Amino acid sequence: VHLTADEKAAVTALWGKVNVDEVGGEALGRLLVVYPWTQRFFDSFGDLSSPDAVMGNPKVKAHGKKVLNSFSDGLKNLDNLKGTFAKLSELHCDKLHVDPENFKLLGNVLVCVLAHHFGKEFTPQVQAAYQKVVAGVANALAHKYH
């Protein structure tokens, strides 16, 4: 991912304020609600029968936190996203058979959640930088599919 120094600074500054537990659960939950076909990958999570059930599901929240912790690792290695996400790409491709389009969907949902949480602080410039990052992460996660 090519980010300018200003974009990297903006991404890093905002990410330092992110509550990974809260934002991770909300982002994954919203993905499962807005794109219900993604729920098929989470059969073991229990009740996903309604938006309230999804958003209150502790397994969704826990996995969302795990996802954002991995995303945090990516932010520390923006110049080597493919290397950073190689094992996760392999897992999601070979074992879980996740449609790589879902990575893009989750990235876009994450951007929406960040905008919701940070309001005016999430300027168009910050959003543009985050869109580059989530696209790069989605591409890295889809790498083993190519």
UniProtKB/Swiss-Prot annotation:
Molecular function per GO: haptoglobin binding; heme binding; hemoglobin alpha binding; metal ion binding; organic acid binding; oxygen binding; oxygen carrier activity; peroxidase activity
Domain Globin: 2-146
Signal peptide: none
Residue numbers carrying Phosphoserine: 44
Annotated PROSITE patterns: GLOBIN
InterPro entries recorded: Globin, Globin-like_sf, Globin/Proto, Hemoglobin_b, Hemoglobin_oxygen_transport
Location of N-acetylvaline modifications: 1
GO biological process, one term: hydrogen peroxide catabolic process
Binding positions for heme b per the UniProt entry: 63, 92
Keywords (A to Z) from UniProt: Acetylation, Heme, Iron, Metal-binding, Oxygen transport, Phosphoprotein, S-nitrosylation, Transport
Disulfide bonds: none
Modification Phosphothreonine, positions: 12
Flavoprotein found in the keyword field: no
Cellular component GO terms, alphabetical: blood microparticle; haptoglobin-hemoglobin complex; hemoglobin complex
Chain positions with S-nitrosocysteine modification: 93
SUPFAM superfamilies (UniProt xref): Globin-like
Matches recorded under CDD domains: Hb-beta-like
Organs and tissues of expression: Red blood cells.
N6-acetyllysine PTM positions: 59, 82, 144
Pfam families referenced in this protein's UniProt entry, alphabetically: Globin (PF00042)
Entry's family note: Belongs to the globin family.
Assembly with partners or alone: Heterotetramer of two alpha chains and two beta chains.
Role summary: Involved in oxygen transport from the lung to the various peripheral tissues.
Listed PANTHER family: HEMOGLOBIN FAMILY MEMBER, HEMOGLOBIN SUBUNIT BETA
Name this protein carries in UniProt: Hemoglobin subunit beta
